[in-house]
């Protein structure tokens, strides 16, 4: 077996040290680090009376949500559930799919679709809230046009990659978190009793006595929405870097939340009219704070967009999403750019901004989808703990506790459904439909692929090669074999070689592609089936690796030639004497589903939707990274079953 890496340059941020911690701040904590911009403002807009017990209770909820949800669940537990160093809900699913559960993929696609839906609202709310801070300096400032301009720039620069500016994100976020902590600390000194919020008693009393507790919890939940992204970025920075950095980040966040609470209690009458985040900033630093907030929003948006590209790349290899064109704008491993997704996200974010107009209305749309993602992650983590032999009592307690907590948050966020939550749920529902249909359709297509034992056809393939009366089709003929059972081959592949148009070649290559549960695996094994004639190459590809069959096959061939296992010099004397290799041609067997071949209406509907969805992706030759000038696509029907309709023979023709 041979192994290769995806990129010539590998960026490794997993080493613990000052640089690693700095990079972690820039990559991982952008989302959760910008939550102080809008969390307290959202709490004040719930309609609850502003008094000491309310603010202390809300702050206590924030502190203990960050502790229970972010620290314990994600930092202490989830970060240990890594797939060869990779994290996130799809990496977790890849670990679990070997359990062969028929429905566990449903949890994964629900979680992934709601996570992606939440990603549409995050850039909109963070950038809008930051720009709204300028209204305190210039009330007539056109917030929406400025916000749209910044969003346009963010999405436009994706095509060029962010390798150069990405290195400065960590330094910027370090300054941002220090600003949060210092501003909060200064404000706390004006109302030291705010420190009582560390006592969970105040959170319990608020939830027990307030008739608006569900609205307050819906706002409080916004403080931890970035926790899922923290888990997804595990592969970029490593568990130790994230854990150490989180201790600093959490401290700065809590100081800022407490500082905002102190300011609110000192300005009860006017608190709901302004954003407490900007109010606690010294007047001579306000403009600097707005610039920093805008920059932090851009960093958060950039990290989120890159994360979505990575998630969808994983989804493609897990067969959850149609294959799309992926570009690598830099040599940094894992840095992707998916043009169609970038455009779709940009349109979505712009529509969100134009629809909701200000951050207060966006807060209603924010949080509901990610609550569902977190609930799905909890369920998958429970299965993971069980599969690792963790004590059943601990597994049940973990799942029970966090399912209860997240179900309460879900109920609280459902109260915002009509006010805006419907938007992210609609987006999430559409994404779920795409993923579900794609998974089911692929299973249907695989189910009806007919296979045959390959060794039964060794002799006829050898005879075709030796039969010079058959025109030579290519020196090297390559097929992608979709048969899953070892030693078998797709029957339409044999039909293509033998029956449809006998294809004589010097060498026949069968490519078997196996997408494995590990992220960065890229290996192959080669078996000679007929000496100097038929070869079977099995490629094991990790779920984060882009399948580039042409590139990988070239490396395989170079290895085999170097080892003397195959002679690929052209059979034509004029070319052979000059050591020129023979040509390669790829044959792709594309099965077309015809609804007329099935009586199953539900299946026909699903396959019709699948046909529509497939139009947003690229065709199989491009998906496999093949040179299209060397590819022939043969379309054949996907036979589901044969209807009983048959043509009746008559013995006497009617005269006309």
What are these language model-derived features?
Residues 2-656:
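The structured alpha-helical core of multi-pass membrane proteins
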């Amino acid at each position: 077996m041979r192994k290769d890496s995806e990129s010539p340059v590998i960026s490794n941020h997993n080493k613990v040290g000052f640089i690693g911690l700095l990079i972690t701040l820039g990559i991982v904590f952008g989302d959760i680090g910008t939550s102080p911009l809008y969390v307290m403002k959202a709490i004040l807009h719930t309609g609850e009376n502003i008094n000491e017990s309310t603010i202390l209770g809300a702050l206590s909820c924030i502190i203990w949500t960050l502790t229970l949800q972010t620290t314990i669940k994600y930092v202490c537990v989830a970060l240990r559930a890594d797939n060869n160093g990779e994290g996130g809900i799809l990496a977790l699913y890849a670990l679990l799919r070997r359990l062969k559960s028929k429905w566990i993929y449903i949890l994964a696609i629900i979680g992934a679709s709601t996570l992606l839906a939440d990603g549409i609202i995050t850039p909109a709310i963070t950038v809008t809230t930051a720009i709204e801070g300028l209204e305190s300096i210039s009330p007539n400032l056109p917030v929406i046009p400025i916000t749209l301009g910044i969003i346009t720039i963010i999405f436009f620069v994706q095509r060029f990659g962010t390798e150069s500016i990405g290195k400065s994100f960590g330094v910027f976020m370090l300054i941002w978190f220090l600003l949060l902590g210092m501003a909060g600390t200064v404000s706390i000194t004006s109302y030291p009793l705010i420190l009582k919020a560390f006592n969970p008693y105040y959170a319990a009393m608020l939830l027990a006595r307030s008739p608006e507790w569900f609205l307050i919890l819906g706002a409080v939940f916004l403080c931890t929405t970035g926790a899922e992204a923290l888990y997804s970025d595990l592969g970029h920075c490593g568990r130790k870097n994230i854990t150490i950095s989180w201790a600093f980040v959490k401290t700065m966040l809590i100081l800022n939340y407490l500082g905002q609470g102190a300011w609110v209690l000192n300005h009860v009458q006017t608190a709901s009219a302004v954003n407490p985040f900007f109010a606690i900033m010294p007047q001579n630093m306000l403009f600097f704070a707005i610039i920093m907030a805008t920059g932090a929003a851009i960093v958060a948006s950039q990290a989120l967009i890159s994360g979505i590209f990575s998630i969808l790349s994983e989804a493609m290899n897990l067969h959850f999403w149609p294959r799309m064109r992926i570009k690598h704008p830099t040599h940094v491993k894992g840095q992707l750019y998916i043009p169609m997704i970038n455009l779709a996200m940009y349109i979505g974010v712009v529509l969100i901004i134009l629809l909701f107009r200000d951050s207060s209305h966006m807060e209603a749309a924010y949080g509901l989808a990610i609550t569902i993602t977190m609930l799905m992650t909890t369920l998958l983590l429970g299965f993971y703990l069980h599969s690792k032999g963790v004590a059943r009592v601990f597994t049940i307690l973990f799942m029970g506790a966090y399912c209860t907590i997240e179900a309460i948050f879900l109920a609280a966020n459902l109260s915002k459904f009509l006010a805006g939550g419907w938007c992210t749920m609609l987006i999430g529902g559409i994404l779920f439909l795409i993923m579900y249909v794609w998974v089911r359709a692929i299973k249907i297509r695989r189910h009806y692929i007919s296979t045959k034992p390959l060794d039964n056809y060794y002799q006829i393939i050898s005879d075709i090669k030796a039969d010079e009366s058959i025109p030579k089709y290519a020196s090297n003929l390559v097929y992608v074999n979709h048969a899953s059972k070892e030693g078998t081959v797709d029957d339409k592949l044999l039909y293509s070689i033998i029956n449809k148009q006998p294809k004589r070649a010097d060498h026949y290559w069968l490519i078997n592609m196996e997408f494995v549960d590990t992220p960065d695996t890229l290996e192959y094994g080669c078996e000679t089936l007929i000496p100097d004639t038929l070869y079977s190459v099995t490629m094991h590809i990790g779920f984060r690796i882009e399948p580039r069959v042409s590139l990988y096959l070239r490396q395989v061939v170079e290895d085999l030639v170097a080892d003397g296992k195959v002679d690929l010099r052209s059979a034509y004397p004029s070319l052979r004497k000059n050591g020129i290799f023979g040509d390669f041609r790829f044959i792709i067997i594309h099965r077309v589903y015809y609804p007329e071949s099935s009586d199953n209406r539900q299946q026909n509907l699903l396959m019709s939707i699948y046909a529509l969805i497939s139009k947003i992706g690229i065709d199989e030759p491009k998906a496999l990274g093949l040179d299209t000038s060397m590819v022939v696509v043969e379309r054949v029907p996907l036979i589901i079953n044969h209807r009983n309709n048959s043509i009746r023979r008559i013995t006497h023709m009617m005269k006309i």
